[in-house]
Amino acid sequence: MLPSLGLPRLSWMLLSCLMLLSQIQGENSQKELPSARISCPSGSMAYRSHCYALFKTPKTWMDADIACQKRPSGHLVSVLSGAEESFVASLVRNNLNTQSDIWIGLHDPTEGSEANAGGWEWISNDVLNYVAWETDPAAISSPGYCGSLSRSSGYLKWRDHNCNLNLPYVCKFTD
């Protein structure tokens, strides 16, 4: 049997160990889980549960999205996090030999009628929580209403363009 003073000490030590263990386990559970292994068609790359493909033949924003829709659940890419932005930027930098911006699935169907550039959304209907504007469209005197990855930012920031401009594009789809 433990002396009466030993039991509170032992309880305190046990409680401290349990608290430390829960913190360590909590840190591990917050890390991103490894992506599911998916098979993507030739010419595309997997990231998490989607396939991504860069198309070098320039098209208007609408024609590019129509081309992307030929793939299962396909649209111009929606960039939902900084990690996904880095993946897409790397895909573009490693496969494109032109000095061009790249269409993404961001657009403003209100054509600027909502205050503070509030009309911007993803064509895929994903929620626009992550933003990476090179220059806020609300600060531009004559903005375009379709989004692109900016070459000058290493494809890590967004820029608005006239939707009828012909640019290469990235599709995001399932397969």
UniProtKB/Swiss-Prot annotation:
Keyword annotations: Disulfide bond, Lectin, Secreted, Signal
Pfam families: Lectin_C
Top-level lineage group: Eukaryota
Propeptide: 27-37
Cellular component annotations (GO), alphabetically ordered: extracellular space
Domain C-type lectin positions: 38-173
Primary location class: secreted
Localization, UniProt: Secreted
Tissues where this protein is expressed: In pancreatic acinar cells.
GO molecular function terms noted in the UniProt entry: oligosaccharide binding; peptidoglycan binding; signaling receptor activity
PROSITE patterns reported in the protein's UniProt record: C_TYPE_LECTIN_1, C_TYPE_LECTIN_2
Signal sequence segment: 1-26
Disulfide bonds: 40-51, 68-171, 146-163
BP GO annotations: antimicrobial humoral immune response mediated by antimicrobial peptide; positive regulation of cell population proliferation; response to peptide hormone
Job of this protein: Might act as an inhibitor of spontaneous calcium carbonate precipitation.
Subunit structure: Cleaved to give an A chain and a B chain joined by a disulfide bond.
Name used for this protein in its record: Lithostathine
Name of the gene: PTP
